A protein has these predicted regions:
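Short amphipathic alpha-helix used as the core "switch/output" element in two-component signaling
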Residues: 46-50, 72-85
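A Lys-centered signature of the CheY-like receiver
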Residues: 115
Length: 131
């Protein structure tokens, strides 16, 4: 059974997707767009921070393990919490050895998903966080 469309959002809410995997970025971009969100994708935390993304984003989805990058998703979470504590941050990971969900929630994350991501659950959480 496919994803049910929950609702279209107006005005467009901007969701930043930070993941070094092109397929994950594209998949999340398409999922978010199908629910009426505007997704802005970044291959690294550094690219996100160098853009106007931090000031424009209504929610951030960040991979915790960003290969070949200087800043991890955890460091990005800490930076966002220091400068924009009101912006929801959802952490994602594909690593089975990653720390438990409670660790990231204690650090200020608003949600945590393991890949492959349950699209309906992700959209439901974003809807909840942005209402």
């Amino acid at each position: 059974m496919g994803l049910n469309k929950l609702k279209m959002h107006s005005p467009l809410r901007i969701i930043a997707v930070i993941d070094d995997d092109d397929r994950v970025r594209e998949s999340l971009h398409n999922l978010l767009a199908s629910y009426g969100y505007k997704a802005e994708a970044f291959a690294s935390a550094e690219l996100f921070l160098a853009s106007d993304g931090p000031s424009r984003s209504d929610c951030i989805i960040a991979d915790i393990h960003l290969r070949k990058r200087q800043m991890t998703g955890l460091e990005l979470l800490e930076r966002v919490r220091g400068s924009q504590p009101e912006v929801p941050v959802i952490i994602i990971t594909g690593k089975p050895s990653s720390r438990p969900e409670a660790f990231y929630l204690d650090k200020g994350a608003n949600g945590f998903f393991r890949k492959p991501i349950d699209g309906q659950a992700l959209i439901a959480l974003i809807d909840l966080l942005l209402t």
